[in-house]
Amino acid sequence: PATQVITDEMARAAANVTGANRLLIGLGWSLVILIYWLKRREKLDLRGEMNLEISMLIIATAIMGLIVVFQQVSIILAVVLIGVYLAYLWISSTGESEEPELIGVALVIGSLPVARRRATVVLMFLYAAAVILLAAEPFVHGLVETGAEFGIDEFILIQWIAPLASESPEIIIAVLFTLRSNPQAGLTTLVSSEVNQLTLLVGSITVVFSISAGEVMSFPLDDRQSIEFLLTAAVSAFAIILIAPRVLGARVGLVLLGLFIVHLFFSDPGQRLIFSYIYFGLAIFLIVVDRGRIRQLIPRRL
């Protein structure tokens, strides 16, 4: 990877994916936990919930470690990540599920005949994809120019502003679930999104990169991007260990939110590396003081 040129566009892709993942955990997870505690003044009990999502997140986090070691998202790892995502879809679709309570637009669409309902959903996906394709490039160029005007590092700008725009709908939905006394669905939504990001999104980067290059290639990372992937893996590992008991009080939410906010003020790669060690150190500390957390991560059933 060191011999390959890392273009601005490649750096932006790495910035976006790492920022999105840390935003979901640091802001999304913490908001659900804290809002529930403020509303009910009790801990969020998720025992027996999210077994599949947590298991897949553990696998994806471990693969993030391999990406850092090899300093690239190799085509092999990309295929593995996409395979993990497809396995997640298959297992979740064949498992037990509850019929959702539809309201508003969802209720209207759900009431349509099967053929019309499927056609409507497909058209909505196509419309959303078209909007993203038309808006993404001007949006990124606007961010870069704004950053240059105010002297803001474009890597940091792309890492946080772009994910804030793309991930805010999921976070808002999770918050609405929580306000409607369904925090389990809210947090499951965000953990599932985290799995999607670390598997399908990261794997797709290499696939798209290979298509644009006209040959099968790995997606290289420079030192800064490798550190960002390491920090993302560290945040994910710590969060997994932290929520392992599945009984989450305000302290858990405050820790996730506090660490997330503090690390935003340190953008230097060396400082980010230190934060990676801090997150890993905290994860190890939690395991040492409560070894049962590892056992609690082993699902009895998916």
Where are the model-predicted features located?
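Hydrophobic alpha-helical segments, chiefly the membrane-spanning helices
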Residues: 1-302
